[in-house]
Amino acid sequence: WLHGHYQGQYADGLRTPFIIHRAEGEAYDYDDDYTVVLADWYHEKNGYILKHDYLKQNGSYPTPDSGLMYFAHTKKGLEAKTMPGMNENATLPFEPGKTYRLRLINMSATTVFDFWIDGHDMEIIEADGVDVERYPTDTVQVAVGQRYSVLVKARDEPTKDWTIHANMERVTFGDVGDLKLNLTSRLTYGANGQEMGEVEERSTSGKKLMDDTQLVPKEEVGLDKPDKRVTLVVKTGLDKNKVQYASFNNTPY
């Protein structure tokens, strides 16, 4: 995805998906392709938040005002100029028996999302631009900036519609306040809408829902033998002025 970092521009909306297709063709077969954008949203400009909330003594990043989930139909084999663009609060239309690729992108400033679809299984096939061996999972945990592609097989019996879930991890924030943590949309099997399938509510916050260390690249690339070792200790915390910073070996950036 593309985004601007100057004064937190991407948190204010300067961000968009950017899909690069393999010249030799996709690593897996599927029938259709959607991009799913997950994000948090602040009503104040990010520059104001940095100055008045984060970069002050004992400051912290405030709780978002809302979460966002929206879709783009990035249809397999078509150029970008033919794409219809993003659609917020849309439904995701499936046809029975087809296999769909969903490209999940977390464009948040601070929020981790837990994504699943009731009544459907998923297989991770790509992580951060790297094709991986099929990894079955019922939930995809997407950190800030991460990208995953999953294959979802449509049901053979189109008798019900199903709920799409994107839970915002509450451990990211302090006081949640009025923030709605569970975003939902609708996976449909018909133009007129149908009875909803059973909704599966999950308590996901603070839990490890998938083991990304088990993802295996589909095309392995060997590592060179190192001749020098560099140790970096990465942490976040308060500097000497009690301002929040991330640091390498206790040097803040």
What are these language model-derived features?
Residues W1-H5:
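General structural concept
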Residues G8, I105-S108, A154-D156:
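Non-cytosolic beta-sheet module surface loops
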Residues D12-G47, Y135-Y253:
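Extended terminal and domain-junction accessory segments
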Residues E26, A90-L92, L102-I105, F113, ...:
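Beta-strand elements of modular eukaryotic interaction domains
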Residues E26-Y28, D121-D131:
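Short aromatic-acidic-glycine turn motif
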Residues D32-T99, I105-S108, K228, K235-G237, ...:
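Acidic-aromatic/histidine active-site loop/patch
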Residues G85-N87, E133-P136:
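Short alpha-helix capping/helix-loop boundary micro-motifs
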Residues N106-E123:
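Short acidic, flexible loop segments centered on an aromatic residue
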